[in-house]
C-alpha cells in the first residue's frame, strides 16, 4: 500500500540512490549545489578581511545579518508559493541568478549600500535554495528513495562548505584579492546556472505528463 503513494520520476521510474548518482542530471546539479554552501560559507568566514578591504566596520557587516535572514525567509515562502503554481523545472534554473548579482556587488561595490544590496540578493538565492532542490529531487527521481538521494545532495553541500573557505583563503595567500575572487564566484554561478538550464530543459522531456 505504501508504494502506491510514491510519485515517479523521469521515464516513469522510481530511481534509487545509486541510479540517481549514475545519471548525468545528478552531476549537472552538483556545481549548483556546491555554490551557495561553498561561497556563502566563505563570505562569512572572511568577514573581517572583507570589512577591512571595503573600509567598513565589522559591526556594519554583522548588522546585515538580520536583513539577510529576513530576505531568506521571505524567499523561502515566495519560492514555495511559486513552486506550486509554476513548477520546479521553470523555477530552479533561475534560482542562482541573484547570487550572480550578489557576488558582483560584493566584488565591485563599495560602502554600506553595496552590502545591503549584496546580502539582499544572496538572501533570495539562499531562501530558494532551501525550497526548490527538495522538490527537484522528488520530481525528477521519484519519491521512493527520496531520503537517500537527498542525503547525497546534502553531502555535496557539506563538502562545499569545506571547500569554499579553504579555496578563497588560498587565493588570498596567493595574492588574489577577495574582491577579484568574488567576481570569479559570480562567473561560477553564471556557468552553473547555464549548465543547469541546459540539463533541466533536456531532462524535463523525460518526465511523465502531469495529471490534470
Where are these regions (language model features)?
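Extracytoplasmic gate region of multi-pass secondary transporters
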Residues: 18-79
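Helix-to-loop junctions at the C-terminal end of transmembrane segments
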Residues: 75-87, 172-173
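Structural signature of the two symmetry-related core transmembrane helices
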Residues: 90-104
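Paired small-residue
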Residues: 113-121
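Intracellular juxtamembrane helix-capping segments at the cytosolic ends
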Residues: 128-141
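A late C-terminal transmembrane helix in Major Facilitator Superfamily
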Residues: 140-175
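A membrane-interface helix-boundary motif in multi-pass transporters
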Residues: 170-188
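Multi-pass alpha-helical transporter architecture, strongest
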Residues: 184-212
Amino acid at each position: 500500500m505504501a508504494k502506491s503513494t510514491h510519485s515517479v520520476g523521469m521515464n516513469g521510474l522510481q530511481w534509487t540512490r545509486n541510479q540517481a548518482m549514475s545519471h548525468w542530471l545528478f552531476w549537472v546539479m552538483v556545481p549548483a549545489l556546491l555554490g551557495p554552501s561553498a561561497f556563502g560559507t566563505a563570505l562569512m568566514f572572511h568577514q573581517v578581511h572583507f570589512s577591512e578591504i571595503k573600509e567598513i566596520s565589522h559591526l556594519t557587516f554583522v548588522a546585515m545579518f538580520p536583513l539577510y535572514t529576513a530576505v531568506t525567509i521571505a524567499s523561502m515562502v515566495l519560492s514555495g508559493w511559486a513552486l506550486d503554481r509554476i513548477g520546479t523545472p521553470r523555477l530552479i534554473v533561475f534560482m542562482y541568478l541573484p547570487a550572480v548579482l550578489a557576488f558582483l556587488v560584493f566584488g565591485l561595490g563599495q560602502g554600506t549600500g553595496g552590502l545591503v544590496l549584496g546580502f539582499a540578493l544572496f538572501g533570495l538565492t539562499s531562501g530558494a535554495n532551501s525550497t526548490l532542490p527538495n522538490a527537484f529531487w522528488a520530481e525528477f527521481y521519484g519519491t521512493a528513495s527520496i531520503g537517500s538521494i537527498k542525503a547525497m545532495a546534502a553531502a555535496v553541500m557539506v563538502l562545499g562548505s569545506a571547500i569554499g573557505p579553504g579555496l578563497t583563503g588560498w587565493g588570498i595567500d596567493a595574492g588574489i584579492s577577495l574582491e577579484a575572487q568574488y567576481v570569479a564566484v559570480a562567473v561560477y554561478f553564471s556557468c552553473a546556472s547555464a549548465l543547469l538550464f541546459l540539463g533541466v530543459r533536456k531532462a524535463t522531456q523525460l518526465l511523465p505528463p502531469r495529471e490534470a
